[in-house]
Amino acid sequence: LGKWRNEDTGAMDLTECKIVYVAPMKALVAEQANHFRSRLEPFGVVVNELTGDSQLTKAQIAETHVIVTTPEKWDVISRKSSDTSYTNLVRLLIIDEVHLLHDDRGPVLEAIVARTIRRMEQLNDPVRIVGLSATLPKYQDVAAFLRVDTACGLLYFESNYRPCPLRQELIGLSETKAI
């Protein structure tokens, strides 16, 4: 966001920049939208949620700087080739729980990423794609799919980076009893 911030006034000029945050569940969408709203509102950044339960008009979408949405809803929005005025302004696509690429929702996330990359290549207009996950054992594969430059654009934090230590234990059971 700093790229679009006026250093003198602190105001944000986000008329040419939109951010999309994709979260897997409506509850997480609502939680993240509220969190972002409380943090970004002082800078004049408009955050809205867009799910199957919450609708936005075209005018509301145009006024929104950060859309927090589900994969299915963003898939529908970004697939519409008749109205690309909003999707062409997306400069940052954040996919939370990106490990779900290997789940039932994987094809929807793949379509979103592929569409974003294709649009980027067609318009020669860069979009930063960020994947977030707390459990991603094969992060190199996901990085390759997201076309991350692993020399400078891949950030991987091991468990010792956690602010509070994680204790792991393995408990062996020799016998199971039915309840």
Where are these regions (language model features)?
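Conserved P-loop/Walker A NTP-binding site and adjacent catalytic elements of P-loop NTPases
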Residues: 1-178
